[in-house]
């Protein structure tokens, strides 16, 4: 404040000085004199036409008042003239004036005033000093020309945003963020328990899982100012700009508190300190230090919540992750089976689907995909349909779109010789048959020899449920699966090819992980080896030396080689035993180019899968399984044996939903229900996502016409299930048009068409939920908005289609949410033509042949 006052006073003084200088400069007494040449003035003196004369010695000029007017430069009636003369001619001019017949003359010897002399010296100094102070002040604040100012964008109500209803497949993350919204809306409930709002929230997870979407949903739901900025916006070429932008950002936030700041890709500025190689000054460290101080330093940060997103939490500085800065760290992982179904249903809104399109089957085939991948699959399917002039998205379009996302587009123009095509058919057949003959690996869902992306073919497995834990036999079965292609080449042609390079790479990763990470090798033991000292540019040490001796490294290499050799032997023996099946499979592949599960079941109907034998010699000698003792049964297994309904596990997610619903009803009864932000245009609420408030709820016995009450709000049934007292009719608030704070009741009466008006608030009406002709219930993802008279869609060629009808999908006994997710070995695609994995692939251990390793 003092600096601002000094600057104001200095500016006023400078303006006054400038005005005085200009006044003294332009207030001259020679305005009425016409300036003429010196010769004209001398001629008037010689002619005696001068009445008065004045010599200004300092300015070296002479002013003459004439007796008779003259004409100067076509100007008539000039009576006063002024002329300049050189300094050395001053005596001659004086003699001329003295000799002329003038009435009077005078000599004016002027001296510069003290004020003018001081102005000529002080004014430039004041201007220079003022400019320096201006630039220095701008450097401390926003920087020169705004270089150091914050680039954060504040979202306003007019900007299109998302809501929690637009987020699917991340229910736990939504619930964690919903708590922040509740705290901002109703802090008294939390403050009564002494709770404080989290000061920082870090969203981390793989790319494409919806971290930024969650932040946009918070912006649409929070109801407070929301600032968004990228981590790279803090990094500039000028020293100190990053720290200045951090200060300016938090200054704006504090002025508008309570508010939320979202920093996307915070790893650009939040990497661990001490990672410089040359020992010099690191501008990023200065920015990070300022960020740490602003998040939890000596100053107050009341009412400012910092959200951040990154897919590299391992490189962040430990001081940034401690409680008090990021109190809550929320993982946003790839969705499970149920989450994929919800995401596909969200992105299926507005897309017409053919009757054979099955969203649930697509969700099972896309294990390991992120939400962005799933959205891309449906978009590719729509583009394929538009390319062929179709009006509905078919199952073939979904399958082709999945293959395009996984392995790339088809290379239809590639010329392949007959011999290479035959080698590819046997190579992929070796993978398929090796997996089919083992119990410890999923059956192959699809095998093809069509060139796609950088692969010449691939075999894909599809799991029934999401798995997160693998035993030794299951991992070894994947090694056998990977070695099947090379074994087929050796068995049939007698020589290997380069097509198995990606298979060898994937198998080596699995085998090395079994030995060095999972402790499955008796020779090495249960010790984690192979941990490098770290990346020298990540702040976690440098050098890259292994943390074990050369003798241990040799033992590890020996064990890895043993696993690969044994898997090679097992796959070779399987193919040699079922050589006839391999020939029939290769023949069918050469004919149809693509085979699916029904075709493979018909070819391999007489193959009995075997269990993997003992992997390591005498592996069960030291720690054998106790005989005649079985593990205990889970409550679900016991309930199924008794023919009872499986018990429902306690869920904090469901309990918090029930609490929010109960709180919503209380506020609704009091007429204090806050207005919920509308969902973004064109996006319907996701299944399983947090439901918004759309006015007074319908009666408890109301249901969609024809649905027998199936579509009642799930939140209405949860309180009693989660141990909360159910609301009795006597406790229910009276239903009235004004019970929600003056808003109209959308559930008042059905419309003339029979469709309840309240369903419009949820994104779809009765006509979308029910088939009016049959009364059958539709899945939202499989509903076409318009029913075309002739359905045209993308279809695969006849020779690529299955000769056998698809069998109904087997429902799993356990719900997909019962399984836990634990990262295992990332698998590689099984391709038969390239030594490199497919571009844009995913780490997916449970879907080994799905070309996403």
From Swiss-Prot:
Gene from which this protein is expressed: ftsH
Question: Which GO biological process entries does UniProt record here?
Answer: protein catabolic process; proteolysis
* HAMAP family documented for this protein: FtsH
Cofactor dependence: Zn(2+)
- If you read the UniProt record, what top EC class would you report for this enzyme, in one word? hydrolase
Against NCBIfam families, the record matches this protein to:
FtsH_fam
Q: How does it sit in the membrane?
A: Multi-pass membrane protein
The transmembrane residues are 6-26, 114-134
Q: What does this protein do?
A: Acts as a processive, ATP-dependent zinc metallopeptidase for both cytoplasmic and membrane proteins. Plays a role in the quality control of integral membrane proteins.
Q: Which Pfam families match?
A: AAA, AAA_lid_3, FtsH_ext, Peptidase_M41
Biased composition range(s): Polar residues: 728-739, 770-788
Tell me the leader sequence span: none
Q: What is this protein called?
A: ATP-dependent zinc metalloprotease FtsH
Instruction: Give GO cellular component annotations, separated by semicolons.
Output: plasma membrane
Give the subcellular location.
Cell membrane
List the active site: 428
* Residue ranges annotated as Extracellular topological domain: 27-113
Q: Which residues bind ATP?
A: 205-212
Basic and acidic residues composition-biased segments: 619-632, 639-648, 796-813
């Amino acid at each position: 404040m003092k600096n601002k006052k000094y600057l104001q006073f200095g500016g006023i003084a400078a303006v006054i000085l400038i005005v005085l200088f200009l006044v003294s400069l332009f207030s001259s007494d020679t305005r009425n004199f016409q300036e003429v040449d010196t010769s004209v003035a001398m001629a008037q003196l010689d002619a005696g036409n001068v009445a008065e004369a004045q010599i200004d010695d300092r300015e070296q000029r002479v002013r003459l008042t004439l007796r008779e007017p003259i004409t100067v430069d076509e100007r008539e009636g000039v009576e006063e003239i002024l002329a300049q003369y050189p300094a050395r001619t001053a005596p001659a001019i004086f003699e001329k004036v003295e000799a002329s017949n003038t009435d009077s003359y005078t000599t004016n010897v002027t001296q510069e005033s003290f004020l003018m002399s001081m102005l000529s010296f002080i004014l430039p100094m004041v201007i220079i000093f003022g400019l320096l102070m201006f630039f220095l002040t701008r450097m401390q604040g926003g920087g020169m020309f705004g270089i150091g100012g914050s680039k954060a964008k504040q979202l306003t109500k007019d900007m299109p945003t998302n809501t929690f209803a637009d987020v699917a497949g991340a229910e736990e993350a939504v619930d964690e963020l919903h708590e922040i919204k509740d705290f901002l809306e109703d802090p008294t409930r939390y403050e009564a328990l002494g709770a404080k709002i989290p000061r920082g929230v870090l969203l981390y997870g793989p790319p494409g899982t919806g971290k930024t979407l969650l932040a946009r949903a918070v912006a649409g739901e929070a109801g407070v100012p929301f600032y968004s900025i990228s981590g790279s916006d803090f990094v500039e070429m000028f020293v100190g700009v990053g720290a200045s932008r951090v200060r300016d950002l938090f200054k704006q936030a504090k002025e508008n508190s309570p508010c939320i700041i979202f920093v996307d890709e915070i790893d650009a500025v939040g990497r661990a300190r001490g990672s410089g190689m040359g020992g010099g000054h690191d501008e990023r460290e200065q920015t990070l230090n300022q960020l740490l101080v602003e998040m939890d330093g000596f100053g107050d940060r009341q009412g400012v919540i910092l959200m951040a997103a990154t897919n590299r939490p391992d490189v962040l500085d430990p001081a940034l992750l401690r409680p008090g800065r990021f109190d809550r760290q929320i993982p946003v992982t790839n969705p499970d089976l149920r989450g994929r179904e919800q995401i596909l249903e969200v992105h299926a809104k507005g897309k017409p689907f053919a009757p054979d399109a099955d969203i649930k089957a697509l969700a099972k085939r896309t294990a390991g995909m992120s939400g962005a991948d799933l959205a891309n699959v449906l978009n590719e399917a729509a583009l394929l349909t538009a390319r062929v002039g179709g009006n509905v998205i078919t199952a073939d379009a979904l399958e082709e779109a999945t293959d395009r996302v996984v392995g790339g587009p088809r290379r239809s123009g590639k010329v392949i010789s007959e011999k290479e095509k035959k080698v590819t058919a046997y190579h992929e057949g070796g993978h398929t048959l090796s997996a089919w003959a083992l119990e410890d690996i999923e059956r192959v869902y699809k095998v093809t020899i069509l060139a796609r992306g950088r692969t010449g073919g691939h075999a894909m497995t599809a799991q029934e449920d999401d798995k997160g834990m693998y035993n030794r036999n299951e991992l070894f079965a994947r090694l056998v699966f990977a070695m099947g292609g090379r074994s087929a080449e050796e068995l049939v042609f007698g020589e290997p090819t380069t097509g198995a390079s990606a298979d060898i790479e994937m198998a080596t990763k699995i085998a090395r992980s079994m030995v060095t990470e999972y402790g499955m090798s008796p020779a090495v033991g249960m010790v984690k080896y192979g941990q490098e000292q770290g990346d020298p540019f990540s702040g976690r040490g440098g050098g890259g030396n292994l943390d074990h001796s050369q003798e241990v490294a040799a033992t590890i290499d020996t064990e890895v080689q043993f696993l690969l050799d044994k898997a090679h032997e097992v796959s070779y023996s399987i193919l040699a035993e079922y050589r006839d099946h391999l020939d029939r499979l290769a023949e069918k592949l050469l004919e149809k180019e693509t085979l699916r599960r029904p075709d493979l079941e018909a070819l391999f109907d007489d193959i009995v899968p075997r269990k993997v034998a003992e992997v390591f010699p005498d592996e069960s000698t030291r720690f054998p399984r106790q005989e005649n003792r079985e593990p205990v049964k889970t409550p679900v297994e016991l309930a199924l044996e008794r023919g009872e309904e499986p018990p429902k596990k306690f869920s904090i997610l469901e309990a918090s939903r029930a609490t929010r619903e109960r709180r919503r009803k209380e506020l609704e009864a009091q007429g204090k229900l806050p207005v919920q932000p509308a969902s973004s245009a064109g996006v319907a609420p996701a299944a399983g996502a947090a439901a918004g408030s759309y006015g007074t709820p319908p009666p408890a016995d109301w249901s969609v016409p024809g649905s027998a009450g199936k579509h009642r709000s799930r939140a209405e049934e949860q309180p009693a299930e989660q141990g909360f007292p159910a609301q009795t009719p006597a406790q229910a608030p009276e239903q009235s048009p004004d019970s929600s704070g003056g808003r109209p009741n959308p559930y008042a009466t059905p419309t003339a068409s029979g469709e309840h008006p309240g369903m419009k608030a949820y994104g779809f009406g009765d006509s979308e939920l029910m088939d009016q002709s049959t009364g059958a219930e539709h899945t939202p993802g499989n509903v076409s908005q318009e029913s075309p008279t002739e359905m045209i869609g993308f279809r695969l060629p006849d020779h690529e289609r299955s000769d056998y009808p698809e069998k109904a999908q087997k429902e799993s006994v356990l719900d997909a949410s019962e399984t836990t997710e634990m990262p295992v070995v990332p698998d590689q695609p099984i391709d038969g033509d390239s030594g490199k994995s497919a571009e844009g692939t995913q780490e997916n251990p449970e879907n080994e042949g799905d070309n996403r390793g």
